[in-house]
Amino acid sequence: KIFLAIIVIWGIAYLAMFPGIYDYDSIDQTLQFLVTGNVSGHHPVLHSLLLSGFMKIGYVVFHSYEIGLGIFTLLQVLFLAYAAMKVAWFLLQKGYNRLFWFTMCFYLCFPLHYIMSVWDTKDSIFAGFFVLVSLSLIEMADRTSGFWDNRWNLVKFVFVLGGADTKK
């Protein structure tokens, strides 16, 4: 229900700003892969590859870079909504009911959240991974014994830590 509430509100922003906010960094990032072929480390290579890759898929399949950008943006919206849901769910599990409702209102009503969810910049994805790394660290501190016994916890932590490397 938490995820659905976020998706409904942010989905309106996605539809209003389809295929997403394509900013100056995104232009430079996609030029590296789609036009020049000269890839530099000025922007995170993985983010540049994902953004360009989805745009190329959109062009190949639908004859539209915009559709590819829209698919990338949709996946980004879903990922950021998942990260926001994890924060809200964490607060609810810990019994912070008032803080949960405040957080939900903040995620749903503060425009910057849904604008950043459709903004195709590396900062948006970095923010989502930063939230997930922070939640993982809190979970480690809460469960000092037994956290590392579960290999799935290690896999999740390495994944979110690696994903947080989308920012220089």
Show which residues each predicted segment covers.
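Membrane-interface junctions at the ends of membrane-embedded or membrane-associated helices
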Residues: 1, 92-94, 138-155
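Transmembrane signal-anchor helices characteristic of membrane glycosylation enzymes that use polyprenol
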Residues: 1-22
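Extracytoplasmic catalytic/substrate-binding loops of multi-pass membrane glycan-assembly enzymes
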Residues: 17-31, 38-54, 62-67
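Short acidic/glycine- and proline-prone juxtamembrane loop motifs at membrane-interface regions
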Residues: 24, 115-125
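Specific aromatic-rich, kink-prone transmembrane helix
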Residues: 34, 86, 126-145
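Transmembrane-helix motifs of polytopic, lipid-linked glycan transferases
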Residues: 74-94
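Short helix- or helix-capping micro-motifs
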Residues: 100-111, 164
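Membrane-interface alpha helices of multi-pass inner-membrane proteins
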Residues: 151-168
